[in-house]
């Protein structure tokens, strides 16, 4: 469920007409709903009631500080994967003891920043990383809390580019080697082993891969405890998907996921961390764009819009589907037309949809890309020297620009021309 609904013939974001925001901000832009963000966070938080837990929002999905602050005030921790994300979370008021640091390529500077500013734990991905964290911790005179990310070799049944739990993926250590790696971690004086980390992929639409991975984690927990390790925290990653299409194939609900976690891991008495990103932010955001031209081709019609692949890369990168709807509600029974919906970037890959049925549209009409709140603005670029588009947050009957559109001078003047030119 989200809070982008038609009312009186027009699309609203909570209690604000989307067209009103477009008239103020200009198109294209991202638009987020506070009510939807909070609803999705609380669905996850409530699903784990009865277990000691922390929901750490995976801020790589959408990292604007206004979104982070909204979720942190509701009780969320943060999962970060870079120094920039760590500093962004801190700037949004998130305390270090509610931030977990993931990622396969943590640098010494990133580790030093997190240890100096406070960190809940590092999710360690390799033995060389373990050595670096130990060295930096000893240099600073602190002890670094760590979990080790294990790779359970489970097929997440998702897009190959976002699968992370199979043996050929770059993430974690093979679960078969976990006991020797934990023994080595325990011997390093700058580290404190506190738990296990696992994350098998993104946009999962079944519970079975999660359950198989978590069963392996449960077995490993008991083995490591028998070896003398104090395993009291399990970071289960994220990955639960969202419905991008209107089909009946909806992913499991958070409450169903929570029940599975309880029956699979509840007997261990561990603190549980989960790292949802897409499920919290995905349906909480839309991208609004304007039709520039309607062009008739040899065998098809094109809707050329002012949003482009540099603004929303998912369709070009992942062949991802987004429901695209007119901001003015079409009349009941209106005849549909098939369009290829494309942007102005000079690549054929700048295509959002092919043969998509839409009501007849004209230049100047607004369209909204649903389920664009996750991996939208954060993956945008300035390709073709197109400025990053604004982000707007709605809260009830009010809205605010939370990232403005830079002007062309700002973008161009970042360049430095050498003296010899």
For each predicted feature, which ranges?
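Active-site loop/helix belt of alpha/beta enzymes
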Residues: 152-294, 358, 384-386, 395
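Glycine- and other small-residue-rich loops at beta-strand/loop junctions that grip anionic moieties
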Residues: 56-57, 78, 103, 122-125, ...
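Active-site-proximal loop/turn and secondary-structure-junction residues that shape catalytic pockets
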Residues: 61-63, 84-85, 105-106, 126-128, ...
């Amino acid at each position: 469920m989200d809070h982008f609904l038609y009312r009186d013939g027009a699309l609203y974001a909570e209690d604000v007409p989307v067209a009103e925001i477009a008239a103020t901000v200009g198109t294209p832009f991202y638009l987020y709903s506070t009510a939807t963000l909070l609803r999705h966070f609380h669905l996850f938080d409530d699903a784990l009631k009865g277990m000691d837990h922390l929901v750490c929002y995976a801020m790589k999905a959408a990292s604007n500080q206004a979104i982070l602050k909204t979720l942190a005030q509701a009780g969320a921790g943060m999962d970060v994967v870079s120094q920039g994300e760590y500093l962004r979370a801190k700037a949004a008021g998130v305390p270090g003891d509610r931030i977990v640091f993931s990622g396969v390529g943590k640098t010494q500077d990133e580790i030093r920043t997190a240890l100096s500013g406070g960190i809940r734990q590092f999710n360690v991905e390799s033995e060389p990383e373990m050595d670096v964290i130990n060295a930096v911790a000893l240099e600073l005179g602190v002890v670094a809390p760590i979990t080790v990310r294990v790779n359970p070799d489970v097929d997440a049944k998702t897009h190959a580019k976002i699968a992370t739990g199979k043996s050929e993926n770059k993430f974690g250590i093979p679960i078969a080697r976990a006991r020797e790696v934990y023994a080595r971690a325990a011997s390093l004086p700058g580290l404190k082993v506190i738990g296990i980390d696992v994350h098998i992929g993104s946009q999962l639409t079944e519970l079975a891969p999660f359950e198989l991975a978590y069963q392996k984690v449960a077995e490993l927990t008991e083995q490591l405890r028998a070896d003398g390790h104090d395993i009291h925290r399990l970071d289960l990653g994220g990955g639960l998907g969202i419905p991008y299409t209107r089909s009946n194939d909806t992913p499991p609900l958070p409450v169903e996921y929570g029940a599975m976690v309880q029956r699979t891991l509840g007997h261990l008495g561990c603190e549980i961390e989960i790292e949802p990103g897409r499920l919290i932010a995905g349906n909480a955001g839309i991208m609004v764009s304007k039709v520039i031209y309607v062009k008739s081709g040899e065998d098809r019609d094109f809707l050329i819009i002012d949003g482009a692949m540099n603004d929303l890369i998912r369709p070009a990168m992942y062949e991802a589907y987004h429901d695209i709807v007119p901001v003015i509600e079409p009349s009941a029974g209106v005849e549909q037309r098939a369009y290829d919906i494309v942007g102005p970037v000079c690549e054929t890959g700048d295509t959002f949809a092919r043969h998509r049925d839409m009501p007849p549209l004209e230049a100047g009409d607004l369209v909204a890309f649903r389920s664009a709140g996750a991996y939208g603005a954060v993956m945008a670029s300035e390709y073709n020297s197109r400025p990053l588009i604004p982000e707007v947050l709605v809260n009830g009957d009010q809205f605010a620009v939370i990232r403005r559109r830079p002007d062309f001078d700002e973008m161009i003047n970042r360049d430095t021309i050498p003296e010899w030119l």
